[in-house]
Amino acid sequence: MSEQEKTPPAAAEPQPPVDNKPTDAPAQPEHPPTDGNDKTEQPATEAAPAEAPTEQPKQDDAAQPADNKPDYLAKNPALSEFFDRLPAILSSAGHNEMWGVTLRDSADVPTVNVMIKFLRANEGNVKQAEDQLIKALQWRKEMDPTALVDTASYSASKFGGLGYLTTYQDANGKETVVTWNIYGAVKKIDETFGNMDEFLKWRVALMEMAVKELKMDQATTVMDYNADEDPYQMLQVHDYLNVSFLRINPNLRAATKKTIEVFAMAYPELLREKFFVNVPAIMGWMFAAMKVFLSKNTTRKFHPISNGANLAREFPSPLKDQFPKAYGGNGPALQDNARTVNLVADPEPAQEASKDEAQEAPKDAPKEEPKEEPKEEPKEEPKEEPKEEPKEESKAETTQESADAPEKNDAAVTEAPAPAAEAK
């Protein structure tokens, strides 16, 4: 009877009491009407979407390094390889400063621009660029170019009027840095170029002043490796007006070749154009020397100009007007507004005069000494005391003293000519 009592509620449903599973049936209408086996497949389909999101982030993580690589490295494998060697380069050189930039990594824009210049100077050859960068870093460590500008001073008689630095602006406000070498201002060739180390330091100091004006350490944009225009380059002007000694002077030849060699190694890709103005015909040897040490990309930037007054014509109107009048512009003379290295007057002549006086002073002193010695002899009172005593002992003493007196006089006589001989 108890089972029959349970059947009435089951009888209320259209299914017989044998089908106890209709209790699960209400869950089926929530899904599409498919086979009864869908109940067992549903847990598998529900687990699949849970695993999918766990696999997707792994694929994204693997793709992140390639996506985060800067374009200037992704598009330039040689530059990327160059940066891979940078830690070893800095370790080998023992120095990390180049042109005011502390070399760091590929995320530092000023560092990237420096690396691009060294790589371009070697036409993309990573090994050659590495060797040159190491040499340049070692050279800067030894030479300390920053100190040559900040603390060193140079002879005004040797280098005064020989080098200048100017900065002009074009129509867009962009600055153009120009270094000037006025070789016609050299007064004494051997004094200016005779000491090669001194001349090179002066020339490096002028170059470093120009490099500072480029402001490479303040760069915020990576320069285009393949672009012809480089915002971190300067102009150089060499004026040979009234120069007639270049053909035969060996000191100038040696200084010029050494400067070209050092600058090609230590300052690659910093030159936009170089103008040789008022050039005499005998200077062919200098251009031949430049081709030996400099690349074709650099020598193609050289422009000889026979008349210096035509220099300003090489530039657009807003810029050429700022050039000095002597070079075809309307600007002031270099001596009036250009900058230069720290020059000081030579104190050497005054020092030499004082040395001569100091050497002569001791020679005069001995001449007076023998004159004073005879004056001291009468001060010896024992000679007079024995005269007052009538004893015979006193006579003996006087005879001994009189015997000693000639010896003292002889000594005075022999010593007197000695100073005279020194004076001669």
Swiss-Prot record:
Domain CRAL-TRIO: 152-335
Cofactor(s) the protein requires to work: heme b
GO molecular function: metal ion binding; phosphatidylinositol transfer activity
Domain of life the protein comes from: Eukaryota
Topology in the lipid bilayer: Peripheral membrane protein
Gene Ontology biological process terms, A to Z: Golgi to plasma membrane protein transport; regulation of exocytosis
Classification via PROSITE patterns: CRAL_TRIO
Keywords: Cytoplasm, Endoplasmic reticulum, Heme, Iron, Lipid transport, Membrane, Metal-binding, Microsome, Transport
Basic and acidic residues composition-biased segments: 32-41, 353-398
Region (Disordered): 1-74, 348-424
InterPro entries, alphabetized: CRAL-TRIO_dom, CRAL-TRIO_dom_sf, CRAL/TRIO_N_dom, CRAL/TRIO_N_dom_sf, Sfh5
Subcellular location: Cytoplasm; Endoplasmic reticulum membrane; Microsome membrane
An annotated GO cellular component: cortical endoplasmic reticulum
Annotated Pfam families: CRAL_TRIO, CRAL_TRIO_N
Residues holding heme: Y183, R203, H238, Y240, K274
Catalytic function, reaction form: a 1,2-diacyl-sn-glycero-3-phospho-(1D-myo-inositol)(in) = a 1,2-diacyl-sn-glycero-3-phospho-(1D-myo-inositol)(out)
Record carries keyword Endoplasmic reticulum: yes
The keyword Transport belongs to this UniProt entry's keyword annotation: yes
Biased amino acid composition, Low complexity: 42-56, 411-424
Similarity section: Belongs to the SFH5 family.
Function, as annotated: Non-classical phosphatidylinositol (PtdIns) transfer protein (PITP), which exhibits PtdIns-binding/transfer activity in the absence of detectable PtdCho-binding/transfer activity. Regulates PtdIns(4,5)P2 homeostasis at the plasma membrane. Heme-binding protein that may play a role in organic oxidant-induced stress responses.
Protein name listed in UniProt: Phosphatidylinositol transfer protein sfh5
